[in-house]
Amino acid sequence: MAGHSKWSNIKHRKAAQDAKRGKIFTKLIREITVSAREGGGDPETNPRLRAAIDKALSNNMKRDTIDTAVKRGSGDLEGDNVDELTYEGYGPSGVAVLLECMTDNRNRTVSDVRHAFSKLGGNLGTDGSVAYLFNKKGVISYSDGVTEEQVMEPALEAGAEDILAYDEGSIDVITSPENFGAVKDALDAKGLEASNAEVTQVPDTRVDLDEESARTFLKLLDALEDLDDVQNVYHNADISDEIIARLDD
């Protein structure tokens, strides 16, 4: 299909910035702990935990660290009392923004989030104001070197919902959250190494941003992702690879 993977360019930028800030392990451990607390400590019966562990392993987290986080979540070890919160809002040019947070202090978190929105041209919305624009999906991405033919049969047989192939050579395999682990296992078994694999919030529609709007929006995105309590930031902005490259220079 025409264009490029709609979440690849900003995802790669975000991953690099998370690593630079040294925050990626903190967020991964928090997600593993809460996933185990909510759905149990067995990744075979807890798809969310399975996805969190896979992501941690892909970021070279040690298995001992993962096991400790699972035990804290499942109650085998003492852990922090962390709440999950979702906030919704709009960025510049009407971009919808959905935040997943984990916090031990709700008042601090909402104050920090509201400040970031108001400072950088956005506004914090009410519950339900943008969540309906997103659907939770598993996304397994492949870059150059993996063909649509290679992923088609094993992905669909394992329960994938869709396969999107883009002009520049990348491929996204779309799954339900429940089938994410099974589909990834099937593709891994074929020796197909994903460039990125996660359960995420996929927007129904996108808002195209020009360079100036993108510059403003990315400042807001950086500010939100830099907040300690913010776990994930989802949005429906579409920014071209060329604009991303110019703004990163």
From Swiss-Prot:
Keywords: Cytoplasm, DNA-binding, Transcription, Transcription regulation. GO terms for cellular component: cytosol. GO terms for molecular function: DNA binding. It comes from the Bacteria. The keyword Nuclease does not apply. Signal peptide: none annotated. GO terms for biological process: regulation of DNA-templated transcription. The keyword Protease does not apply. It is found in: Cytoplasm. Coiled coil: none annotated. Belongs to the TACO1 family. This is Probable transcriptional regulatory protein IL1088.
